[in-house]
Design a protein with these regions (language model features):
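N-terminal targeting leaders
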Residues: 1-179
Length: 179
């Protein structure tokens, strides 16, 4: 079976839903935490799976952020990678942004890995991958990302599917779009 590389492996509705999830959960967390708890939280959604990264000043703030995300509409699951610590400074954020760009550049030029099927998030030197990929694509993406200078650790939160299952999924999505 051939694996689609040009089209997103999520339905158009799932892509839009993920964008809405990110914005809504960001807003909900900022409203819930308020100005009392210092935090820098990044919300990344892929296929209904929500990844929380960043820093929160207190354990209570961390728990509130996670619970808020879990209660949000259309969330399949929440992955908590929030650290209880002082917010990373601008130097660390710039370094993370640069590392994310390097990882994306390497992935886009790697044969048999399709950046269009993944999101790359970097927080404090840790690279997180999210997407819908085959076991081979996941393994290769992990290997490529881990070889980028500055990557302290690489973690995949990708949904792993066989090439056949992805091909069927793409046919189903195409069928839905043609109706």
């Amino acid at each position: 079976a051939t694996v689609s590389t040009l089209t997103d492996r999520r339905s158009a509705g799932a892509v839009v839903n993920d964008e809405v999830l990110e914005k809504r959960i960001n807003w909900e967390i900022s409203q819930t935490l308020g100005k009392n708890i210092d935090s820098h939280i990044t919300v990344t959604a892929y296929n209904g799976k929500v990844l929380l990264t960043g820093e929160v000043a207190t354990e209570q703030g961390r728990q509130i952020a996670v619970q808020t995300a879990e209660r949000s509409l259309d969330v399949a699951s929440v992955i908590n990678e929030l650290a209880v610590m002082e917010n990373a400074g601008i130097g660390q954020r710039l370094s993370d942004s640069s590392l994310a760009t390097k990882v994306r550049s390497r992935l886009v030029t790697t044969e048999n890995v399709y950046l269009s099927q993944m999101k790359v998030v970097v927080e404090r030197g840790v690279v997180y991958l999210m997407g819908i990929v085959t076991p081979q694509e996941n393994e290769l993406a992990l290997k490529v990302a881990s070889r980028v200078g500055g990557a302290a650790k690489v973690i995949s939160y990708c949904d792993i599917m066989s090439a056949e299952r992805i091909a069927q999924r793409m046919r189903d999505i195409q069928g839905q779009q043609n109706q």
